[in-house]
């Protein structure tokens, strides 16, 4: 008898999912995986040409909707456009985020940068979830996945605004789960480590290695 276990293929046929920050990087990977699993997806981003090109590549299962996570009106309009394009929403992946502060000490960080990171990563995640809530509740089995970061769990240095924002996302996820659970909406967060994507290409190799070592110390 073979001891090899085969992974069960996850199918999401007909599920309708909005992914923020999906024009590149992890968001793009999520969108591709969702479509491959049978879901219908709305790609939202501020990188319009990239987002539109990805939607065209993925075919009729994907749509692009512009959305600026620093702008409340843009978020509301984007979520409504996504729900209209898909005929509702079953899932939301709050992936969109910015760093903007990598490599700076907390003393070097300016208040404007701090506020910008919080606006996008924290306020944007909150407002997107609020806007999507009626559609997710109507689904009967709504799902929200928030993107946190393991840097918030071990306290990566020279990344203060970002790790603070991702710590807030973890706390918000717990609160959202309690508030939205009775409405049939499940809320979870994932906290990936430093991922080699276009948005992290600026990070020097020695810093990658430091992150790998330091989080285990």
Sequence positions of predicted segments:
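Canonical Rossmann dinucleotide-binding motif of NAD(H)/NADP(H)-dependent dehydrogenases/reductases
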Residues: 9-42
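The beta1-alpha1 cofactor-binding region of Rossmann-like NAD(H)/NADP(H)-dependent oxidoreductases
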Residues: 48-49, 67-79, 111
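Substrate-binding pocket helix/loop in short-chain dehydrogenase/reductase
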Residues: 103-106, 110-115, 200, 211
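Active-site helix of classical SDR
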Residues: 129, 165, 173
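Alpha-helical segment proximal to the catalytic Tyr-Lys
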Residues: 134, 178-182
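Residue(s) in the substrate-gating loop at a strand-loop-helix junction
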Residues: 149
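Active-site loop-to-helix junction immediately N-terminal to the catalytic Tyr of the SDR YXXXK motif
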Residues: 155-163, 175, 203
